[in-house]
Amino acid sequence: MNIRPLHDRVIVRRTQEEKTTESGLIIPDSATEKPSKGEILAIGNGKINDNGDVIALDVKVGDQVLFGQYAGNEIKVDGETLLVVREDDIVAIIE
């Protein structure tokens, strides 16, 4: 299924963090928080300002980003859980 977000929204796939500690202990899913890092899969056309002009987004498909832990709405696409996030909820691009 193809999905294209509207306006200033982006589709993000969460990046899984390591589930073992440096000493080799395995951390169960119930003890870990949802990761706040992910990869941009799709972007909208941009934010519309008060004059009706479209302002392009700063992020692009493929960018690795950091976002708020509770940002966005989870959706299921082809059995995969993805996030729909506003660009304002993205705090950094990882370079």
Swiss-Prot record:
Gene3D superfamilies noted in UniProt: GroES chaperonin
Disulphide bond pairs: none
Keyword tags: Chaperone, Cytoplasm
Protein localization: Cytoplasm
GO function terms (MF aspect): ATP binding; metal ion binding; protein folding chaperone; protein-folding chaperone binding; unfolded protein binding
GO biological process: chaperone cofactor-dependent protein refolding
First and last residue of the signal peptide: none
GO CC list: cytoplasm
Domain of life: Bacteria
Alphabetical list of CDD domains matching this protein: cpn10
Record InterPro entries: Chaperonin_GroES, Chaperonin_GroES_sf, Chaprnonin_Cpn10_CS, GroES-like_sf
Entry-linked Pfam families: Cpn10
Function: Together with the chaperonin GroEL, plays an essential role in assisting protein folding. The GroEL-GroES system forms a nano-cage that allows encapsulation of the non-native substrate proteins and provides a physical environment optimized to promote and accelerate protein folding. GroES binds to the apical surface of the GroEL ring, thereby capping the opening of the GroEL channel.
Assembly and binders: Heptamer of 7 subunits arranged in a ring. Interacts with the chaperonin GroEL.
Family to which the UniProt record says this protein belongs: Belongs to the GroES chaperonin family.
Protein name, entry field: Co-chaperonin GroES
Organism: Ruthia magnifica subsp. Calyptogena magnifica
